[in-house]
């Protein structure tokens, strides 16, 4: 839950999910001080990925080596918290407008939600905050590609991806294999 005062419960959600695993993790990284508040979230990356835990990195994170793991909740460049907060918001959006999730759902809809990784683009450093510059760059890039009739090409699922990646792991829009 993302609250109006900019507080959220991402660490509580991750702590709950982690409690379902036999090993420590898979979510990791919490803000200090913790004082035992998140007993099932290790501070540092746990051992056991791919054995007792899900894989640490999807194929896309192995391909884009600077991309962070979705399991990292805290620290520079982490995306785990964004994923935990963003997925329910996207799901809620689907109640109000025809929405598809790329690459899992390829049918036509009014809104297409896709995972992005701004670092695959040359970022226009035009804003005070780096995140704002990154979002502005990605939006402008996709807008230009759409005007030029090239966005459809970008949204074609790379042919070299296997079905497991397409249906289970997902992919980052615009990333090349």
Listing of model-derived features with the role each one plays in the protein:
Residues 1-177:
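RNase H-like (RuvC/DEDD) metal-dependent nuclease/polynucleotide-processing core
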């Amino acid at each position: 839950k993302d609250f109006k005062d900019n507080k959220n419960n991402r660490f509580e959600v991750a702590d709950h999910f982690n409690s379902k695993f036999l090993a420590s993790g898979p979510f990791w990284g919490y803000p200090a001080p913790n004082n035992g508040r998140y007993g099932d979230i290790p501070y540092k990356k746990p051992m056991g990925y791919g054995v007792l835990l899900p894989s640490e990195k999807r194929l896309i994170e192995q391909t884009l080596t600077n991309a962070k793991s979705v399991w990292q909740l805290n620290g520079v460049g982490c995306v785990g918290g964004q994923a935990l907060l963003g997925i329910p918001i996207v799901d809620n959006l689907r109640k109000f407008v025809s929405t598809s999730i790329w690459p899992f759902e390829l049918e036509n809809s009014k809104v297409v939600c896709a995972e992005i990784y701004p670092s695959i683009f040359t970022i226009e450093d035009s804003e005070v905050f780096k995140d704002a510059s990154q979002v502005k760059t990605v939006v402008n890039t996709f807008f230009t590609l759409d005007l030029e009739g090239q966005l459809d090409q970008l949204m074609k699922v790379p042919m070299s991806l296997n079905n497991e990646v397409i249906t289970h792991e997902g992919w980052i829009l615009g990333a090349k294999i």
